[in-house]
Swiss-Prot record:
One of its GO terms (biological process) is DNA damage response. Residues 63-79 have a biased composition (Low complexity). Signal peptide: none annotated. This is Uncharacterized protein YfgI. The gene is yfgI. Residues 34-61, 82-103, 158-179 have a biased composition (Basic and acidic residues). InterPro entries: Uncharacterised_YfgI (IPR020231).
Length: 179
């Protein structure tokens, strides 16, 4: 019993110490619980902050990716436009060259036609000259023939007149007294 009594005395003496200790323990538990909650809140806040950073980084990455995609698209569009402009310029140059070539061909064709017309005019003029020469030649031949005919006629008439004169002279001679 001594032991029980001793325990009871010790317990009664230790009750305020235990009570105080229990209060301290409860406070310590509450404080530990509060620290746990604070730590949990801090961890949660850190997690939220980390998550927000990750979300912000993801947004930034997407924005950068979109900007890069937009830049690539703009570059591709600019390159496509440049290629199209180059093709249009080449097509325009080809068209201009073709038109210039066709204009040159038309000009050459017109020159050929003018030369052919001038040649034809010259040939016609020359033919007219040849015709005029031929007419003059024929006129000259006609004049020669006419002259020969006139000369022959004159000779014939002269011969006839001579014969008449000779005949008359013979007649007169025969009619004369002194024959």
């Amino acid at each position: 019993m001594k032991k029980v009594f001793l325990c009871a005395i010790l317990a009664s003496l230790s009750y305020p110490a235990i009570a105080s200790s229990l209060q301290d323990q409860l406070s310590a538990v509450a404080e530990a619980e509060q620290q746990g909650k604070n730590e949990e809140q801090r961890q949660h806040d850190e997690w939220v902050a980390e998550r927000n950073r990750e979300i912000q980084q993801e947004k930034q990455r997407r924005a950068n990716a979109q900007a890069a995609a937009n830049k690539r698209a703009a570059t591709a569009a600019a390159n496509k436009k440049a290629r199209q402009d180059k093709l249009d310029a080449e097509a325009s140059a080809d068209k201009k060259r073709d038109q210039s070539y066709e204009d040159e061909l038309r000009s050459l064709e017109i020159q050929k036609q003018k030369l052919a017309l001038a040649k034809e005019e010259a040939r016609v003029k020359r033919e007219n000259e040849f015709i005029d020469q031929e007419l003059k030649h024929k006129a000259a031949q006609t004049d020669v023939v006419q002259s020969e005919a006139d000369a022959n006629r004159n000779m014939t008439e002269g011969g006839r007149d001579l014969m008449k004169s000779v005949g008359k002279a013979e007649e007169n001679k025969s009619d004369s007294w002194f024959n």
